[in-house]
């Protein structure tokens, strides 16, 4: 039933596009994080000097001097410089944390998109497991009368597929595991080990970042997490490709 929805040729096109996309996206995100880290490191001293000058001007200005009354540092003896330097370091660390968090949020969203595409590939290769997923969902008699059994079931399936977009990262992985009906812990990706607990931690981090509940996230940690996220995308792509014995193909232009 609904075998007409299967299309291994389209699945092969998607495999090639997905593989290229994963490699390109990982390279761009990790490289940009590295460049930002280097840029901030080189600019740190110059920014510190500018911040110190700005603090001194504020302390000496008649309009703003009142805000520094009772301060333990002064614009006259140079003690303000250490305060300015500490503030600069705090602000730059916050900037780097923000950039690191943004990189992880982007990579997380990309992995979700990859999983959705992989789920689509599984439907193109074998619709049967998907029909099992919706076997307990009702199909109205009126829909069957109006369109016939197969179109009614296809409509129900399409609605179910649309609903998956709202599912979280780990739920999408669970659905992929159900469809593949095999272990998802091992693939042919070198130097990679599937770790559901680590993915859960990354998923929680993404949620915290989205709601501004976490601010101390280092670039080095982000680079490791982001690399793991993209390796995970390749891991699941490899599982799907080998499960259905797929080969990549170039989509005709």
Annotate the PLM regions.
Residues 26, 33-36, 40-43, 50, ...:
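Short, surface-exposed, charged/polar-biased interaction segments
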Residues 1-31, 191-253:
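Polyanionic, low-complexity intrinsically disordered segments
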Residues 62-200:
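Helix-loop junctions and short alpha-helical segments
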Residues 1-102:
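Charged alpha-helical initiation segments
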Residues 10, 29, 48, 54, ...:
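Low-complexity, compositionally biased segments
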Residues 6, 37, 44, 158-161, ...:
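Residue-level detector of alpha-helical secondary structure
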Residues 4-15, 22, 29, 41-48, ...:
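Intrinsic-disorder-associated interaction segments
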